[in-house]
Amino acid sequence: MTPHSENTNKAKHFLFVPHGLWGHLRPAINLIPNLLARSPRALVTILIPVAHYQLASKELWKYDLDKHDQVKVIYYGIKEDHEKKDHAKTDLKGMMGFINDIVKVIEDNYEKIVKSEPIYDAYIGKEVPTHPIPPGVVMIEVSTTPFTIPLCEKINEQLGLNVEMAVWTPLSSNYVAWTVCIPSEGRSYRDRVEKIFKAPEEDRTEAYNEQLGENEEVIHVLDNAPVHVFEAQPNQRDNFMEIALGCLPVLPRVTMVHSWPSFLGQEYKKGAAALGIKVPQIGPQLPKPSNHGTELVQGKLKEFLDKTLQERGENSVIYISFGTLLFPANLEQLSILLDVLISLDKRFILALGLSSEEAQLMAKEKIDNSDGKGIWLNWAPQYPILKHKATGWFLSHGGANSTMEAMRTGTPLLFWPADADQVWIANQFPRIHKAGYEFLQIRNGPNIGRTTYTGVKVNGTEQAIRDEFTEVFSKLDEDFGKELREGIRILGERMENDPFTEEDWKAFVEL
C-alpha cells in the first residue's frame, strides 16, 4: 500500500452543497481551510452554482483552494450565468431559483459522487473526477432540507452507506431558536405557522395576522430578550415560514451546522438537544484579516476614507449597508436618513445594494450634492471598509455575516433589520449585550401604532423617524456611543477566544 492510498483510506470526505446566496456560499468556502486546519487529511467536495463563478473563484483563490489536491470545486448550472454575476446581490426570486438548482444537482449527481463516478462541471464543460472515497459527511443548504435530505437518505439506504447528514445553516442561532425550539414564554413558532397553513387560502392573511403579524402576546425566545410576537416581523411579512415549516420534521435526523459564535447560542443548544437536534455552532467562517483580498484598493472609496481619517480622525465614518438579499429601507425612509446625516455634517458611505431604482436615483442625487459628506457605491467591499480606522459605525440590516465582521473589527452596530435572523440579532445585541442600537420608528405594517416590549410606541411618521435618527446620530461620540463600542469590543474578543466554538468544531470534525 502506498503512502497516498493509506492516507486516503484514513481520510474523511466532506461533501458541501451550500446555497448560491453569497451570505451562505462565502462562509461555506471559508469553512474549507478551517476544516483542513483541524482535519489535515480531510477530503472536500464543494458544489457551487456557476452563476457565482466570478465571486467564488476569487474567494477560493484567497486560500489557494482552486488548486488544492484535497479539494474538488465543481460548478453546476448554466454556464452563461457566470457572466451575469459579478456582484454578491441576489433577490428573493433568485434565492428560490438557487434552491431549485440545488435539488436538481443532488438528483443528478449525488449517487455518482457517493459511487466516486465523474460528474459534469458546468464551467469547464466536461465531466471531472470525484474523490476516490464516498462522502462520510454530507452537508447541504438548510432551506433545501425537506427535498434534498430524503433524496440522499434514500440513496444511502439503497447503497448500504453510513453517511452523516448535516444541513448548512449560516444563520444566527437565536433566530433558529425562534423557528425550531420551544420559547421559555409563549407559544412556539411551529404551532403558530401550522395554524396559518391550516386556514383556508382565502383566510390565510387573517390567520397570519392573528398568529404572527398583529399578535401582541409576549414571547421569550432562547438567547433573546422578550418581545411581543408582532415585533418578530418589524418591517415586512415573514418570507420564510413555509421553508421553515417544511424543515422541522427532518431536523432530528440531521446535524444543523451554524457559522455563528457558540457562546451566543448556549440556551439554544440546550433547547435543540431537548428536541433531539444537534446544533454545532462553529463560529465565523470569514476571511482572516491577513488574507490577500481584504485590503482596500486605490480609488474613490479609499481616498474618501483616508481623507476623512486625516480631517476628522478615527471612527468618524458611518458605513451603511443592508446586505445582499433584502433592502429594508423604503424611498421615504432612506431620504430622511440621508437628509439627517447631511444636516448633521456626518461622513458616510452608502451601499445601494438591492434598493429600488427610484431610491437609487434619489440617493445618488442627494449624496452627489452633499459637498463631499458622503459617497455611494453599487457594491461595497465591506470587510476592508470596516477595517479602516476612519470607519466607526455600521448601520446594518444585522445579518449574521455582517454582524460577525462588525465584531471582528470592533465596529458598533446600528440595526435596521428586515427579516429572519436580522430581527433577532437586532434584539440580542442591543438589549442583552449593549453592543448596538436598533432603530424602532422605521418599523412599518402592524408595528405602527403599537408599543414595543421596551415601552416605545412606534409612530412611524416622517417626524418620528427624523427625530430618532437625529437623536441617535447626534450622540454617537458621547457616552451612549462609547458604551456601544465597548460592548462590541467585548463580544469580538469573546468570539475570537470562544471555547464553546472549539468544542463544537470538534463535534463537527468527528461526525
Regions found by a protein language model. Give the residues of each.
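Glycosyltransferase specificity loop/lid
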Residues: 1-246, 273, 287-321, 326-511
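A short, active-site helix/loop in glycosyltransferases that binds the activated sugar's phosphate group
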Residues: 53, 240, 253-276
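Short, proline-enriched alpha-helix->beta-strand connector loops that line the catalytic pocket
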Residues: 135, 251-254
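Short, well-ordered strand-loop elements centered on a beta-strand within folded domains, enriched
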Residues: 164-167, 266, 278-281
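Donor nucleotide-sugar binding/catalytic pocket of nucleotide-sugar-dependent glycosyltransferases
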Residues: 257-258, 276-288
